Regions:
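Acidic, glycine-enriched loop/beta-strand segments at the rims
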Residues: 30-32, 47-60, 73, 322, ...
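Bacterial N-terminal signal peptides
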Residues: 12-24
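Short, acidic/polar
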Residues: 103-110, 162-176, 221-228
């Protein structure tokens, strides 16, 4: 697995450390190829390869030993290959959630059946165990899992550890990296004045200590000024939208200078306020096939809905969602790599699997084209996770992670929900 660090650390002084610690990065990696059956030839499909290039019409996709051997319109089908007629179907790469949260192995199947074959779980107490379980799982039953472990925070809330001084921050990062996280996450947020916010010298220490040991960093952030401070401190990944103000030229320049990735998590905001009433997607058959009835009941409880109607925080996030959407469009237009993320599983009503598809819908509502939205959940997300040499696009040599759709998502992004089959590493994901 190529663990190139290109554009991650433009600081020559730590180049040797990065080289020595490269194997720490994304240590789990995609699981070994599971497909060992006959060579497959998927014939006649429309292939959207995840690079942003135009769709390949009437394409042939060759799968051998769990990897892509060839894809294109003029592809020779190997002798003895299993020929699969995919006429009228659209094949896309397996989707990548570049910001979600796992808390139980039972959630693996939910993500997979909804076409999410890779997930970055950005903060939680059980994440290292879940990464191990995913790596050891029967082929076709678990996504590729990447994790951050405990979040470096100002307050010890669930899934986080409190660090209040630079020395505490350095020690906490040193403790964390013994488990080889795929990213070190820092949270800079006072939750609309509800608790203290991490000071700049503390998050600087988190980022520096992670970088010194060869680990990249991601940030939970809300406000533009905090996001700029984190960028100046060297953060590698902005894992939420800037929501208080429109981003400016300075912010965009800081993002470009260090090739920082951006995950909008628009549905995170939606989940904060949408349950003031029963949302329309509660009647969507695609949602209902995987939704947890108990969680639905909690969101439909009249007392909970009344609480959401009267919650000042919910109102703030609802009022500021349009800003987040404008910022996504501005950053995409500026050439920043967008990585689809949702914060699914990170709070009440953030339904895993479905919210990834809803996020794509909201990305297009923000002004992205369906192709741009798809790339954010495939090739773009793979770049953000530093795994684009393995997954994210349907190209020769990549893992055979793909989704077969009955309708074209370039016509309507909601067609990503028209899932007929999901494959990971050349193995078909079983139905529920």
């Amino acid at each position: 697995m190529n663990l190139s660090r290109k554009n991650c650390f433009p600081f020559a002084g730590i180049a040797g450390v990065i080289l020595l610690n490269a194997l720490n990065l994304f240590a789990a990696g995609p699981k070994p190829d599971g497909g060992s059956g006959p060579v497959q030839a998927w014939v006649g499909a429309r292939v959207i390869d995840g690079t942003g290039k135009p769709a390949i019409e009437n394409a042939t996709l060759i799968i051998r030993n769990g990897r892509i051997e060839a894809v294109g319109r003029r592809v020779k089908i190997p002798a003895g290959a299993e020929r699969i007629d995919a006429t009228g179907k659209t094949i896309i790469p397996g989707l990548i959630c570049a910001h979600g949260h796992l808390s139980d192995a039972a959630q693996f199947g939910v993500y997979l059946r909804d076409g999410i074959t890779t997930i970055l779980s950005l903060g939680g107490a059980k994440e290292f165990d879940l990464r191990d379980q995913s790596a050891k799982a029967t082929p076709g039953t678990a996504p590729h899992v990447y994790v951050a472990g405990l979040i470096q925070d100002s307050t010890a809330i669930p899934g986080a550890v409190a660090v209040k001084t630079p020395d505490e921050a350095r020690k906490s990062v040193d403790d964390l990296i013994r488990n080889k996280p795929d990213l070190v996450k820092v949270r800079v947020d006072d939750f609309l004045g509800a608790r203290p916010k991490m000071a700049p010298d503390v998050y600087q220490a988190v980022i520096d200590e992670a970088h010194k040991n060869g680990f990249r960093t991601a940030a939970h952030v809300v406000l533009l000024d905090d996001a700029k401070g984190l960028l100046r401190a060297g953060v590698d990944y902005i894992a939420h939208s800037v929501r208080d103000r429109d981003v400016d030229d300075e912010f965009i320049a800081l993002m470009k200078k260090r090739h920082v990735f951006y995950s909008p998590t628009l549905t995170r905001e939606l989940a904060v306020f949408t349950y003031a009433e029963t949302p329309s997607f509660f009647s969507d058959p695609f949602f209902l096939k995987e939704a947890d009835p108990a969680e639905m009941a909690r969101m439909e409880d009249p007392k909970y809905q009344e609480k959401m109607r009267n919650d000042a925080g919910a109102k703030w996030y609802k009022d500021h969602l349009p800003i987040a959407m404008r910022n996504l469009k501005a950053l995409s237009d500026a050439g920043i790599v967008i990585a689809m993320g949702t914060d699914s599983g990170g709070g009440p009503g953030r339904f895993q699997g479905y919210f990834e598809h809803l996020e794509l819908e909201y990305e297009t509502k923000a002004g992205l084209t369906p192709m741009q939205a798809l790339v954010s959940a495939t090739g773009g997300a793979a770049k953000a996770l530093n795994i684009s040499n393995q997954v994210g696009t349907l190209e020769k040599g990549k893992q055979a992670d793909f989704v077969v759709l009955s309708a074209n998502p370039l016509d309507d992004i909601k067609n990503t929900r028209s899932i007929e089959q999901v494959w990971i590493g050349g193995v078909r994901v079983p139905a529920k």
